[in-house]
Amino acid sequence: MTEEYIIDTSIWVDIYEDRKGYNDEPLGDYAFKLLVKIKAKESFIVLTDFLIKELETIYSVEEINGMFKSFEKIIKKVIATEKQREEAKKIAKERDVPAGDALHAIVARDNGLILVTRDGHFRKLEDISKHYKPEELI
């Protein structure tokens, strides 16, 4: 079965801005290497409508399209259901995490996706979906 990955917003920002970590770790490099590996394995990257909306608060449509261009043949789009959105709102309130993070964990769970993030909020969502940092998967 082909693996499918959901890449959190922070990882796309790491790539686009070639960000470094607190100890000068090459976060952008780790993330890019993972995407190259996903492409080489002919696995898929899943984009959600919510991810696109988050990126649009930071970047122009042209910049976002540029981010995805090299990977367009392995991209699948998923639109979160109303039921998933309602569950995310409930979990976000109960666990004090952003609703978008809860939504990505739920979408990952419901679609059998590998969730890639370095956002600490996902530690509170481990029972919904396990998550990995890019460097753990390359």
Annotate each PLM feature.
Residues 1-2, 105, 109-138:
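Acidic, PIN/NYN-like endoribonuclease modules and their adjacent C-terminal/linker elements
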Residues 1-46, 58-63, 138:
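Short, well-structured N-terminal submotif of metal-dependent ribonuclease cores
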Residues 7-8, 46-48, 97-98, 119, ...:
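Histidine- and aromatic-rich ligand-binding microenvironments
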Residues 12, 52, 122-123:
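A generic structural signal for short hydrophobic patches within well-formed alpha-helices
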Residues 16-17, 59, 92, 126-129:
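Short, flexible helix/strand-to-coil boundary loops that buttress conserved ligand/catalytic motifs
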Residues 51-84:
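A short, hydrophobic/aromatic-rich structural module that often spans a beta strand
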Residues 54-55, 87, 124-125:
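Phosphate- and divalent-cation-binding pockets in alpha/beta enzyme and binding domains
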Residues 76-114, 118:
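Active-site neighborhoods of divalent-metal-dependent phosphate/nucleic-acid chemistry enzymes
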